[in-house]
Amino acid sequence: MPLKTPAEYIESLRDGRVLYWDGERIDDVSKSERFRVPLAVASRDYEYDDPGRRELMTYRTEEGELAHRVYQIPRTEEDLRKRLELATTMSMVGGVTGVFMALQAVKDEIAAVNPQYAENIENIWRYARANDLRAAEVITDAKGDRSRKANQQDDPDLYLRIVDKSSKGITVRGAKLHISAAALVHELVVMPTKSMREAEADYAVSFSCPANAPGVKIINRSFAPAKLNEFDYPASAHHSMPEGFVIFDDVFVPWERVFLAGEHRMAGVFARSLGLWERTLGLLEAAERAEQIIGLALLVSEQQG
């Protein structure tokens, strides 16, 4: 499929996903004032017709197709340099789609446990790339009492868990919290939040499901106030991104979308793999923020003579 336009991206989010913000059900993100700024920011990642950005934003796949560079597996120093440069220009929606690199990083290890899981990882990466989709890093559980293991909590759903397995797939229940841009992606890529022991096997789960999958609900929050005006909020009026509390209310996931289902020794491998790519984005953001602070300090000193 061809690369999406900004308008096609926004239209693709009108898929019946269940979203809430301040207790209000959001039926259409394209018509919601709360999502106006985040959508404007995220849709710029689809401006492939910008001649100044197109070369950086895209690459040729092994089949010769044009794809977004966020899906490129860096194999040379130049590949990595371009990826890092791209990361400084992307929105949070584009940035967190790097979760597919975390999956690719564990693919060989998980193949030794279950080759089908590795094949599923490859297939979902190719599917998302071919359809120019975006994905969220869905990892942080509610956790509850941090001194207890996942299976020792008073509420068993404080960590996302498998509640049923069948010949067709798994059913999961629980929630993941503080998920950046969850409401504005197409795929929710779920990983364990930490290493798991044998008694916690039901909590050792990884998969990808559509954001509009039955049983998925996303409760949004943001640092940006509900009513923005450029004078009082010069930054938030142009750049903000919500985070979501993603609730999985007995969500069914077919086996072809599952990457881990009870193999507890692999849970920590998944959790650590995400850190490599997530921390890279964090460091790039820290460097940009440091430049802003230095610039502000210079401006203040100049104003004070």
Regions found by a protein language model. Name each.
Residues R17, L133-A135, K168, H186-L188, ...:
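Structural beta-strand/beta-sheet cores of well-ordered domains, especially the beta-sheet scaffolds
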Residues S30-D49, A183-T193:
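Short, surface-exposed, low-complexity cationic segments
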Residues M1-S43:
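N-terminal-proximal low-complexity accessory segments that begin disordered
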Residues V106-A175:
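Gly/Pro-rich turn-and-neighbor structural signature
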Residues E47-A135, E187:
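Internal helix-loop-helix
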Residues G23, V172-G174, F248:
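Buried hydrophobic positions in well-ordered alpha/beta secondary-structure cores of metabolic enzymes
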Residues N229-G305:
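Glycine-rich beta->alpha junctions and the first turn(s) of the following alpha-helix
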